[in-house]
A protein has these predicted regions:
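Active-site catalytic microenvironments for nucleophilic, acid-base chemistry
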Residues: 140, 158, 174, 194-201
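Acidic, divalent-metal-coordinating active-site segment for phosphoryl/phosphodiester hydrolysis
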Residues: 186-195
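Short, solvent-exposed loop/turn segments at secondary-structure junctions
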Residues: 131-133, 155, 225
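Conserved non-catalytic scaffold segment of RNase H-like nuclease domains
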Residues: 2-148, 161, 165-181
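Short, acidic/small-residue loops that bind anionic groups at enzyme active sites
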Residues: 146-156
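Acidic two-metal-ion nuclease catalytic site recognized across multiple nuclease folds
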Residues: 1-30, 197-286
C-alpha cells in the first residue's frame, strides 16, 4: 500500500497531521433534503470483547447529513457522548488500550433517551466493526434492533481502493492524519473524516456504505459439515456458531451459486446440503 498521492512531498517524505475533529462542522441545523441521508456514526469502549457479558464504559454518537450523490458532509445534526459506570472493576489491560480508568467512569451514566433520539432519526447506523458495537447496543437499547446497521470494515472494499488493511488507525494514517484512538468521540470524528475524505475523487467510501445498506445479504449455513472440514471452512472465511454448532458466512446474491458449488466439492462430497436464507436489512450484523 502507498499513501494517498497528496501526502507525498519531495525526498519521498510523508506529511501527517493530527486530526482532532475541530474541522467538522458542529452545526445543529437540519440541512437534509430529498437527496441526502441521515447517518449515525457510533463507537463504544467496553470492559472487554465478550459481547454477551461485558459492559459499555463509553459511548459516542454523531448524526450527520450526507449528500447521496457526492458523499459530502452537509451538516452535523446532533451528537452525544458519555462515560458509563459499569459498576465493576475495569481491568488494567483494558485501561491500557483505551485510557479509561475506574475513576473516570465513577458515577457516570449514559442518557439513553438522548441516544435513542439520535438513533431514531438516522436512516442507518455505521460502526467500524458493526457486529461488535451492535451486539452491545441491542442489549442496552431496543431501538437498535430495528435499525439498519452497516459496517465500515466489511461494507467498503478497501482492498480495491488500494489499502491492504481495514484497521481504522492504519487507514487514517494512509490518508494523512492520526488521532487519539480508542476514545469514543475521537474514533467517531476520525471515521467521519475517513469516509468523506476529499482525496477520493470518484466515489467516497461513505457512498459505498449508503449503497450497501439497501443490498440484500444472504446467510449460507454449512450445517452437518464433517468435523474434518472445519479448517477449510475457516480458511474460506466461515464463522463458527458455537451455540447451534455449524459454520456460516454472509454473501451477496451473485456469490451464492459459486459458494454452493464450493461447498459441494470441498465439504459435502459432491452434493450441496447446506442452507441459504435471506437476511433482512435490519438483521444484518446481529
Amino acid at each position: 500500500m502507498t499513501f494517498i498521492k497528496e501526502l507525498i512531498v519531495p525526498e519521498n517524505k510523508i506529511e501527517l497531521r493530527k486530526f482532532d475533529g475541530n474541522t467538522l462542522s458542529n452545526q445543529i441545523v437540519d440541512q437534509s433534503n430529498a437527496n441526502s441521508s441521515k447517518i449515525c456514526i457510533l463507537d463504544l469502549e467496553t470492559t472487554g470483547l465478550e459481547k454477551a457479558n461485558d459492559k459499555i464504559i463509553e459511548l459516542a454518537v454523531k448524526l450527520m447529513s450526507v449528500d447521496n450523490k457526492t458523499g459530502d458532509l452537509n451538516a452535523i445534526l446532533n451528537q452525544y457522548e458519555s462515560f458509563q459506570d459499569p459498576e465493576e472493576h475495569i481491568d488494567e489491560k483494558v485501561s491500557m488500550v483505551n485510557g479509561i480508568t475506574n475513576d473516570m467512569v465513577d458515577g457516570h451514566a449514559i442518557n439513553w433517551d438522548s441516544v435513542e433520539e439520535i438513533m431514531e432519526s438516522a436512516d442507518l447506523i455505521i460502526a467500524h466493526n458493526a457486529g461488535f458495537d451492535r451486539a452491545f447496543m441491542d442489549r442496552y437499547l431496543p431501538i437498535s434492533k430495528e435499525k439498519i446497521w452497516i459496517c465500515s470494515v466489511n461494507d467498503v472494499d478497501w482492498l480495491s481502493r488500494g489499502f491492504t488493511s481495514s484497521k481504522q488507525e492504519l487507514l487514517c494514517i494512509w490518508h494523512g492524519f492520526y488521532y487519539d484512538s480508542h476514545r469514543a468521540m475521537s474514533d467517531v470524528d476520525a471515521l467521519i473524516n475517513l469516509l468523506a475524505h476529499p482525496s477520493n475523487e470518484t466515489k467516497k467510501p461513505v457512498l459505498d456504505l449508503i449503497e450497501n445498506a439497501s443490498i440484500p445479504t444472504y446467510k449460507v449455513s454449512a450445517i452437518n459439515s464433517p468435523y474434518e472440514t472445519k479448517d477449510i471452512l475457516k480458511s474460506n472465511s466461515y464463522f463458527w456458531n458455537g451455540d447451534q454448532k455449524y459454520w456460516w458466512k454472509n454473501l451477496l446474491i451473485g456469490e451464492i451459486e459459486s459458494e454452493k458449488r464450493w461447498l459441494a466439492d470441498n465439504v459435502y462430497g459432491g452434493h450441496f446440503m447446506g442452507i441459504v436464507e435471506e437476511i433482512s436489512l435490519t438483521d444484518k450484523y446481529k
